[in-house]
Amino acid sequence: MKKLTLLVLSFGLFIACSKESGNSSSENLSTTTILETINSIAFEEDIDALVSESMSLGSNVSSARSADSNADKGPKKFKGDKYGDCATVVEDEENNIKTVTFSDDCEGKRGQVRSGSMIITYSETQGETGSFRQVTYDNFYLNGVKIEGIRRTEILSVDDSSKTMLTTVSDGKMIYEDGTFKTRESAMTRYVHFENDKKTYSTLSGSKSGISTEGVEFSMEITTPIKFVYDCFSTGERKRGKVPVEGIKVTTSGDELISTNFGDGTCDTLVEVTKDGEVETLDLKDIKRGERFKNILKRKKK
C-alpha cells in the first residue's frame, strides 16, 4: 500500500492518504481527480502564504548567523520558526532574488514537511500595481509531494483595505510518492481584504486544466469564488489559519461534470459534491485518493 498525502484546506492540516492499486472504474471523474484539484488549490494557498512571508522579512526576523556587522546580510529565519528551524531565506538584492531553503525534512509548526528550495525573483518595486514575484523550484517537496513549474503573481490593484492579484502556473506538476503525477496550468485571481492592517478574508476565482494521476484530462473552474477566512469559530472552538468556508468549483472531463461546494460559511472540513443531481457530503479529513464516491458514482455507465 502506497502512502500519499492530502493537504486539507482548512486549519493548515495534512493527513496521510492511501491509494489502492487496481481500483478501477468506468467513470473518469473519480474521487482521486476531485481530491487532486482540491489538493492543488490547498498547495497554492500554502505556497502563496510562504512566499508572502519571505518577501516581508525585515525587522521582524532573526538572523541565522551570529550577531555581527555582517549578520543582516546572512541567511534569515522566519519569525518563531513558523516553517521549521531549518528554513532559511537568503536574499540577493542586486539581482532581486530570494532563495528559501528547507534543509532535510523541515517540519513547520502546523505539521507541514518541506524540503528543497524555492527561488523567488521579484520586481524592483513591491506592493504596488504592476509589481510581481515569480517562483521556481529546486527539488522542492511539500509533505512528500514534489512541486514543479513556474508560478508568477502580479498585483492588479491595491488600496488601503484590499489587494487583488493574478497568479498563473505554467508547466505545473505534482509528483506523488508512488511516482504518479498530476499536471496543471492555471490562472487564479486572489482578492485579499484587510482590517486594521490584518488580513480578514480572501477570495479565489479562476480556472485550471491538466491531467490527473489516473491519466484523466480535466478542467476546473471556480464558478463562485472560494472564500477563505483567517480566524473563525466553530462549535465554540477557535480555528486558526486559512479556512475555506464558501465557494463552488466545477470539474469537467469530456461530458462528465462534478461540482464541489465548500459550504455556507461554517468552519469545517465538509464539502458537498454533486453529479447528475445526486449529492454526496464528504469530509476532507476522512476521504482518500483512490477511493470511489459512495453515492454519486455508484451507477456505472451503460
Kindly label every feature range from the protein language model:
Residues K2-V8:
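Sec-dependent signal peptide recognition
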